[in-house]
């Protein structure tokens, strides 16, 4: 599991930062990539990374401001042009379906893979399978905006092979049956309960990716006990009133959310173009004063998520 930040700027592109897009690489977990937001020129940014459009399985849109969606039609079309055939599902607020349909229709763009658009109308679980589930809550922004909590389900513990070998049980199909939790009778009549030969489960990871937002309780709830919290930091602490007026957060407010939520790690993104060169490091310094395990994303930077 790895983050690849494709765009980390706020509002409009700048020389140093493109607009919002984050790839969550789940190559080891499911051989796929999930994309969060898709601002203008996202597919161009992808060319400089290991992200492959054909592997994008899901796209989660936080809200419908242009800096978060204007790259979507182009990416959807290019994925088809490059030979993508596997299904793709897009999640987002009401209006995302119309945006995609109109953009593809007017430009006569035809996708050759199954494309499904899910409009989120209620908070709660928007996706679940055997490996992950994704929950969402409304944030505090000028238009409807969602944050996403991605939860990896606990992974079954390993088969206690050494314990079985010590008992004289030879490797073979019986190992798989025990790993599946079956009750097995050996040739000598010994009964083995598979559940007694499975090690402790490996706890799954929790990832929280927030859209644009003021400091709010929903952010804390989504970030509770997260292994990684990705939070916007459009402004410095001295501009807190301006952040509030424009429905955004400061770096210190992001750190406060991480601290309150007992998150393990904080990554700041959505940085205003006013912070050029190394001036963005002041945002990092302010956040670390409150939450030490803070990093700040830059375009094309990767962040592994350890188990």
Curated annotation (Swiss-Prot):
Instruction: Please verify whether the record's keywords include Repeat.
Output: no
| Active site residues according to the UniProt entry | 67 (proton acceptor)
**What is the reaction catalyzed?**
Endonucleolytic cleavage of RNA, removing extra 3' nucleotides from tRNA precursor, generating 3' termini of tRNAs. A 3'-hydroxy group is left at the tRNA terminus and a 5'-phosphoryl group is left at the trailer molecule
What SUPFAM superfamilies does the record tag this protein with? Answer: Metallo-hydrolase/oxidoreductase (SSF56281)
Necessary cofactors: Zn(2+)
Native source organism of the sequence:
Bacillus cereus (strain B4264)
Does the record's keyword annotation contain tRNA processing? yes
Sequence positions that bind Zn(2+) 1: 63, 65, 141, 212
Protein name per UniProt: Ribonuclease Z
């Amino acid at each position: 599991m790895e983050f690849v930040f494709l765009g980390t700027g706020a509002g409009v592109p700048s020389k140093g930062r493109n607009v919002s897009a984050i790839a969550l690489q789940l190559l080891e977990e499911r051989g796929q990539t999930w994309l969060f937001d898709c601002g203008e020129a996202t597919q161009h940014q992808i060319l400089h990374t290991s992200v492959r459009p054909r592997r994008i399985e899901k796209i989660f849109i936080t809200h419908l401001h242009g800096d978060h969606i204007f790259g979507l039609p182009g990416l959807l079309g290019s994925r088809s042009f490059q030979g993508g055939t596997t299904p793709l599902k897009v999640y987002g607020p009401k209006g995302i379906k119309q945006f995609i349909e109109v953009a593809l229709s007017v430009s006569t763009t035809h996708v050759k893979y199954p494309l499904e658009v899910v409009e989120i109308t209620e908070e709660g679980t928007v996706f679940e399978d055997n490996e992950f589930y994704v929950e969402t809550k409304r944030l505090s922004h000028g238009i409807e905006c969602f944050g996403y909590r991605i939860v990896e389900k606990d992974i079954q513990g390993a088969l206690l092979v050494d314990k079985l070998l010590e008992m004289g049980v030879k490797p073979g199909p019986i190992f798989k049956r025990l790993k599946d939790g079956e009750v097995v009778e050996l040739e000598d009549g010994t009964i083995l309960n598979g559940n007694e030969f499975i090690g402790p489960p490996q706890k799954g990871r929790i990832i929280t990716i927030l859209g644009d937002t003021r400091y709010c309780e929903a952010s804390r709830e989504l970030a509770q006990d997260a292994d990684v919290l990705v939070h916007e930091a459009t402004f410095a602490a001295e501009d807190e009133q301006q952040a509030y007026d424009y429905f955004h957060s400061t770096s210190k407010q992001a750190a406060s959310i991480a601290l309150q939520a007992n998150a393990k790690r904080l990554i700041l993104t959505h940085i205003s173009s006013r912070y050029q060169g190394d001036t963005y490091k002041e945002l990092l310094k302010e956040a670390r004063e409150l939450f030490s395990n803070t990093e700040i994303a830059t375009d094309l930077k990767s962040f592994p998520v350890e188990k």
